[in-house]
C-alpha cells in the first residue's frame, strides 16, 4: 500500500508540473477520471502495473519501479462442492473482468471459486445460506477456526451411515440456530462431503434432505487448503454477511466491482436446480436483481452477472453486453440433468 501511495503522489506531482487537470490526463491516458483520482490517492487495491505505466507514459515519464505486480497467490480451492460453482469458467469470467477495480463484491458467493482465483485485497462477500456463511466467518477468527478444525476431524472419525443421518437431523431441533457457529459450520461441510453427489438441498421447511452418499471414508478437513483459507481471510480486508443480495451491495461505489452469480433462471423443458435454500429465487427475484444491476451500473460500478441463456434473462439485460459461454452442469440429482448448457455473462462495459 505504501508503494501505491508513493506512486500516486508521483503521478499527481508530474500531472501538476505538466499543468494538466485530472480530467485532461484522463482523456490523454484513457484511464477513467474517477479511477485516476483514486490512484493518485493510493486507494486502488486492484490496480495493475499496465494501467500505472499507461499514466506515466501519458505524462512523458518512465515508471521505474516494478513493485506493482501481483503478489504470489495462495493455493486455495472451494471447501465445499456447490451447485453453480464457477471453477470451470474462471478463465472466461476473468477475461471479461475490468482491468482495475477498487473493492470486490460477491453477493451470492457460494463456494467462492472466483474469490479464491482473484484474492482481492478488499472484498465483501454474502450469501443467503446462513450455514455456508458460518463457515466463512470461522476463517476470520483463530479460535473459531481451531474449533471448526477439531469438529471436522471428529466427524471424519465418527462417520457412518447412522452417524450421517443423526447429524442431518440436527436442523429439525428448534435450538439448532442457537448452536455455536463452528458446530453448524462443521455440520454443513460434513454433510456436503458425505451426502449424495455433493448436493446442498433443503425442503420447504428449510431442512437439509439429501440422502447419504454411502461413502466408507469422508475427508472433511483438507489441512493445506484450510490453513491457506485461514491465512487468506486473516490478511485481507474482508466483510462477510448473511442478508438479502440487494443490501449486500448497497455500499458499492463507482470503481468497485460486483459479480452476481444468483440461482439461475430455469428452462421450461429442463430440470434445473435452484433450491439452494427454502426461499425460492423465481422470476420476480430475477427482475429485482436486474433492477439492482441497473442501479449499480448507473453509479459507475463494474458489474458482471452469470445466468442461464434463456429468453427471459436476455430480455432483462438487453441493454447490456451479453456474452454466451458454454458450460457443464456438474451437480444434479439426476444423471441426465448433467451435461452441456449455455450460460451468459452480462457486463455493463465492453
Feature map (PLM): residue ranges:
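Short basic helix-loop element that most often maps to the first helix and adjoining turn
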Residues: 9-28
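An N-terminal domain-cap segment
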Residues: 76-111, 116-117
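Helix-turn-helix DNA-binding elements, focusing on the entry/boundary residues of the two helices
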Residues: 11, 22, 33, 49-52
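Recognition helix of helix-turn-helix/homeodomain-like DNA-binding domains
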Residues: 30-46
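SAM-dependent nucleic-acid methyltransferase catalytic core
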Residues: 74-88, 95, 141-259, 263-273, ...
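DNA major-groove recognition helix of helix-turn-helix/homeodomain DNA-binding modules
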Residues: 48-66
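Conserved acidic-Pro-Pro-aromatic motif
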Residues: 255-336, 340-341
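SAM cofactor-binding core of SAM-dependent methyltransferases
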Residues: 102-169
Amino acid at each position: 500500500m505504501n508503494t501505491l501511495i508513493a506512486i500516486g503522489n508521483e503521478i499527481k506531482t508530474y500531472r501538476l508540473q505538466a499543468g494538466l487537470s485530472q480530467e485532461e490526463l484522463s482523456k490523454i491516458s484513457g484511464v477513467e477520471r474517477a479511477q485516476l483520482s483514486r490512484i493518485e490517492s493510493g486507494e486502488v487495491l486492484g490496480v495493475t502495473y499496465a494501467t500505472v505505466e499507461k499514466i506515466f507514459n501519458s505524462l512523458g515519464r518512465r515508471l521505474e519501479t516494478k513493485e506493482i505486480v501481483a503478489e504470489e497467490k495462495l493455493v486455495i480451492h472451494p471447501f465445499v462442492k456447490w451447485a453453480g460453482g464457477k471453477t470451470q469458467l474462471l478463465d472466461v469470467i476473468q477475461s471479461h473482468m475490468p482491468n482495475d477495480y477498487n473493492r470486490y463484491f460477491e453477493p451470492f458467493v457460494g463456494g467462492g471459486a472466483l474469490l479464491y482465483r482473484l484474492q482481492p485485497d478488499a472484498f465483501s462477500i454474502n450469501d443467503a445460506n446462513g450455514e455456508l456463511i458460518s463457515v466463512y466467518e470461522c476463517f476470520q477468527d483463530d479460535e473459531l477456526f481451531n474449533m471448526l478444525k477439531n469438529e471436522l476431524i471428529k466427524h471424519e472419525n465418527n462417520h457412518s451411515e447412522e452417524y450421517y443421518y443423526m447429524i442431518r437431523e440436527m436442523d429439525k431441533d428448534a435450538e439448532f440456530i442457537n448452536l455455536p457457529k463452528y458446530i453448524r459450520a462443521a455440520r454443513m461441510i460434513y454433510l456436503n462431503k458425505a451426502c449424495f453427489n455433493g448436493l446442498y438441498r433443503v425442503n420447504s421447511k428449510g431442512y437439509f434432505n439429501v440422502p447419504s452418499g454411502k461413502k466408507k471414508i469422508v475427508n472433511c478437513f483438507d489441512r493445506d487448503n484450510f490453513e491457506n483459507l485461514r491465512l487468506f481471510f486473516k490478511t485481507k480486508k474482508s466483510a462477510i454477511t448473511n442478508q438479502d443480495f440487494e443490501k449486500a451491495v448497497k455500499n458499492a461505489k463507482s470503481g468497485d466491482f460486483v459479480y452476481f452469480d444468483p440461482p439461475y433462471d430455469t428452462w421450461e423443458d429442463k430440470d434445473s436446480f435452484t433450491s439452494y435454500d427454502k426461499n425460492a429465487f423465481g422470476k420476480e427475484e430475477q427482475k429485482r436483481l436486474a433492477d439492482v444491476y441497473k442501479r449499480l451500473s448507473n453509479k459507475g460500478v463494474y458489474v458482471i452477472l452469470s445466468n442461464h441463456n434463456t429468453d427471459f434473462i436476455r430480455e432483462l439485460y438487453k441493454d447490456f453486453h451479453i456474452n454466451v459461454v458454454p458450460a457443464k452442469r456438474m451437480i444434479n440429482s439426476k444423471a441426465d440433468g448433467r451435461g452441456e448448457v449455455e450460460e451468459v455473462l452480462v457486463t455493463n462495459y465492453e
